[in-house]
Swiss-Prot record:
Underlying gene: Efr3b
Family to which the UniProt record says this protein belongs: Belongs to the EFR3 family.
Tissue: Widely expressed.
Keyword Metal-binding: no
Stored InterPro entries: ARM-like, ARM-type_fold, EFR3-like_ARM, EFR3_Homologs
Organism: Mus musculus
Name this protein carries in UniProt: Protein EFR3 homolog B
Subcellular location: Cell membrane; Cytoplasm, Cytosol
Length: 817
């Protein structure tokens, strides 16, 4: 019947006649607009016919494609587009099925023009907001086909560019159509993301090629519009901007895999650009998820080449800085923990020369300079990320890093690697470098918060080590914490300026919190400065750091008491150079003389006591004329000019404690304290830091003032503590520790080797002994209550306690309530 109707036009259904009428006899004439208006009006009037109209148009289009009548194909697609734009009703879902079938047919074609035509129609469809979603519609084919078009390798460059841009636009259309509708196909599934994201990144990689082919500035705007790289970037930004919390991981993982597969971490330019796009596109509250993904990827690549790991770390650095402006969530300490773990692994790799801990035939050979570059990248990342954190988080990070520094003790045996280096030493250096990066620029008004006791104790313990590099790092870290007004660079060179006003120092009055800090920790700081000055392995950088530390303490934390103590400390350093009990080299002795001259010149001008300034100036002038080797201008230069004999230093070349005490005492300073020579307090830190000499060959005079009489203060004779008494006390304590360790070893050995019956018998005997002791104690302490009538005499004339129950006792009326 339908076949007969097809022969006679008047008997054909109206929708078919309307569809046939929109096609002209010559396809070059284009769509017949008047007939198209009739078809549109009919579709709007009878929406139930839309599915039949779509099916018939699809039938004609498939036939025209097969017969290579591409003009009619274009007309059919134009008609479909107009119907889609005009019709918004519940029946459009059935029409869309026919439409998508025709688009898929065009995309399957090998003709680039048909592929582009189908993509453009799909993009128009994607921009239409449907009233009712379709539960059964699938876009899997379109994701696969558009992704394939993004990787087009057509011989013609212009056609290849058009196909790639069509593929990107198609992916953009799929994202727009599905991403906001939970009832549609879930575009965030890994099977889709693994195709979409790499396709966009592939086109982003070729941005340099596209820009290099731009022939002239006049054509630049047109070329920019045709640039697949920029279109891919916009699509990627749109995709990531729509990502919810649970979809971030699926979107980021393909990026990491793509960078791995194409070895794009090593140049790190493209990887950094990708993650900048990601960090600026996603919602700020989701930034920490990206950081977590990068940290996990870094751990997964812990055995990759150092250049790959360095690229990941630098990308992590850029991403972390951006994330810190938004929200980094709970990943702050996690990030630092991962970086420090990678730092320790890198040290192990550099020492062993292999990722497996031992060199074998199948193991990769590690290049030490690449591991050093990776370590520097990690330290730089730690510093750059820490600089974005608020003060309270930065303090936590500082304490966290310091807790990871291995302190030298009997519990940390020396470990050697291929080069004979100490693994602990390298770890200490790297962690102290990281700590220095974090502390640089750290601003904290309260020094008690910036340098808490547990942190300061651990830090200063490392300051007593024999390793010169570690000592220098500790000094630099202390300087970074104390310098709160940016004065550090003004003391980078040691000199005896006649007028320090040219330095333009920023000086504030010492706050109450700073005073409390110095009362608690000043002697500890002075002691470490004093001992650091006596190290014979010091070089010019050490003395510059010591000078900077002394100067910054004087500016940031000094009151009158601190000034007096610092002067005593520097005069004690001068005595070290003069007496030379440590047998220091000539350079070190001259450097100590020069250090003392530079600091006393500075502090005299800060105190503005004329007589003090005059004395310091006179000594400096005398040295300039007769002993320039005792001034920083001759010592701290590339080629120091030193004296061959320092044993005959005359008193005119020295700063005299009696003279300084006299002139400062007249200005209100504590002259009695100034007269006392500085003597460092000895602690157990020397033993913990493995120093060669634990005790110093000095005598400590300890004066104890009696506080019993408020009317009169009496002084008891000073107890003389000599080197021998100190040595005996330390040796005795060491012997006690050895005995305790031996006892513990015997107990452990007994429980490991003795039979169970013997151990059980021993424990049972101890339990019975304990019970008997308890019974004796109870007999002594628990007695019957005393008798109110006193004692009575028993037989043999012995007094006997007679106990009366409490409820039978007779109490006076006044005692009864």
């Amino acid at each position: 019947m339908y076949g007969v109707c097809g022969c006679c036009g008047a008997l054909r259904p109206r929708y078919k006649r309307l569809v046939d009428n929109i096609f002209p006899e010559d396809p070059e004439d284009g769509l017949v607009k008047t007939n198209m208006e009739k078809l549109t009006f009919y579709a709007l009037s009878a929406p139930e016919k839309l599915d039949r109209i779509g099916a018939y148009l699809s039938e004609r289009l498939i036939r025209d494609v097969g017969r290579h009548r591409y003009g009619y194909v274009c007309i059919a697609m134009e008609a479909l587009d107009q119907l889609l734009m005009a019709c918004h009703c519940q029946s459009i879902n059935l029409f869309v099925e026919s439409f998508l079938k025709m688009v898929a047919k065009l995309l399957e074609s090998e003709k680039p023009n048909l592929q582009i035509l189908g993509t453009n129609s799909f993009v128009k469809f994607a921009n239409i907001e449907e009233d009712t979603p379709s539960y059964h519609r699938s876009y899997d084919f379109f994701v696969s086909r558009f992704s394939e078009m993004c990787h087009s390798s057509h011989d013609d460059l212009e056609i290849k560019t058009k196909i790639r841009m069509s593929g990107i636009k198609g992916l953009q259309g799929v994202v727009r159509k599905t991403v906001n509708d939970e009832l549609q196909a879930n575009i965030w599934d890994p099977q889709h993301m693994d195709k979409i994201v790499p396709s966009l990144l592939f086109n982003l990689q070729h941005v340099e090629e596209a820009e290099s082919r731009s022939p002239s500035p006049l054509q630049a705007p047109e070329k920019e519009k045709e640039n697949p790289a920029e279109l891919a970037e916009r699509c990627l930004r749109e995709l990531l901007g729509r990502a919810a919390f649970g979809n971030i991981k699926n979107a980021i993982k393909p990026v990491l895999i793509h960078l791995d597969n194409h070895s794009l971490w090593e140049p790190k330019v493209f990887a950094t650009r990708c993650f900048k796009i990601i960090m600026y596109s996603i919602q700020p509250q989701h930034s920490h998820l990206v950081i977590q993904q990068l940290l996990s990827h870094l751990d997964a690549n812990s055995r990759s080449a150092a250049t790959v790991r360095a690229g990941i770390v630098e990308v992590l650095s850029e991403a972390a800085i951006i994330a810190a402006t938004g929200s980094v969530g709970p990943t702050v300490l996690e990030m630092f923990n991962t970086l420090l773990r990678q730092l320790r692994l890198s040290i192990d790799y550099a020492l062993t020369g292999s990722y497996d801990g031992a060199v074998s035939l199948g193991s990769k050979i590690i290049k030490e300079h690449e591991e050093c570059m990776f370590q520097e990248a990690v330290i730089k990342t730690i510093g750059s990320f820490a600089s974005t954190l608020p003060t309270y988080q930065r303090s936590e990070v500082i304490l966290f890093i310091m807790s990871k520094v291995p302190l030298p003790s009997v519990h940390h045996p020396v470990e050697t690697g291929r080069t004979g280096e100490n693994r602990n030493r390298l770890t200490q250096i790297m962690l102290l470098k990281s700590l220095l990066q974090v502390s640089t620029g750290f601003q904290c008004n309260n020094m008690m918060s910036a340098l808490p006791s547990n942190f300061l104790d651990r830090l200063l313990s490392t300051a007593l080590m024999e390793d010169a590099e570690i000592r220098l790092f500790v000094l630099e870290i202390l300087i970074s914490f104390i310098d709160r007004h940016g004065n550090r660079h003004k003391f980078s060179t040691i000199s005896t300026l006649g007028d320090i006003s040219v330095l333009k120092l920023k000086v504030d009055k010492c706050s109450r919190q700073d005073t409390v800090f110095m009362k608690k920790h000043s002697q500890q700081l002075y002691r470490h400065i004093y001992l650091s000055c006596k190290e014979e392995t010091n070089i010019q950088k050490h003395y510059e750091a010591l000078y900077g530390l002394l100067a910054l303490i004087s500016i940031e934390l000094a009151n009158e008491e601190v000034v007096v103590d610092l002067i005593r400390l520097v005069l004690a350093v001068q005595d070290v150079a003069q007496v030379n009990e440590e047998n220091l080299p000539t350079y070190n002795r001259c450097a100590l003389y020069a250090l003392g001259a530079a600091y006393l010149n500075l502090i005299s001008q800060l105190t503005t006591v004329p007589a003090f300034c005059q004395h310091i100036h006179e000594v400096i002038e005398t040295r300039k004329k007769e002993a320039p080797y005792m001034l920083p201008e001759d010592v701290f230069v590339e080629k120091p000019r030193l004296s061959q004999n320092l044993d005959g230093v005359v008193i005119e070349f020295l700063f005299r404690q009696s003279k300084i005490s006299e002139v400062l005492g007249g200005s209100g300073y504590n002259s009695d304290r100034l007269c006392l020579p500085y003597i460092p307090q000895l602690t157990d830190e020397d033993r913990l830091s493995k120093r060669k000499s634990i005790g110093e060959t000095i005598s400590l005079q300890v004066e104890v003032e009696s506080r019993n009489s408020p009317e009169k203060e009496e002084r008891v004779p000073a107890e003389e503590i000599t080197y021998e008494t100190l040595k005996k006390a330390i040796v005795d304590s060491v012997a006690v520790e050895e005995q305790e360790r031996e006892r513990q070893r015997q107990v452990v050995e007994k429980f490991q080797k003795a039979p169970f019956e013997e151990i059980a018998a021993h424990c049972g005997a101890r339990a019975s002994l304990l019970q008997s002791k308890l019974n004796q104690i109870f007999e002594i302490t628990i007695r019957p209550p005393p008798s109110p009538s006193g004692t009575i005499s028993a037989a043999y004339g012995q007094p006997q306690n007679h106990s009366i129950p409490v409820y039978e006792m007779k109490f006076p009326d006044l005692c009864v309530y």
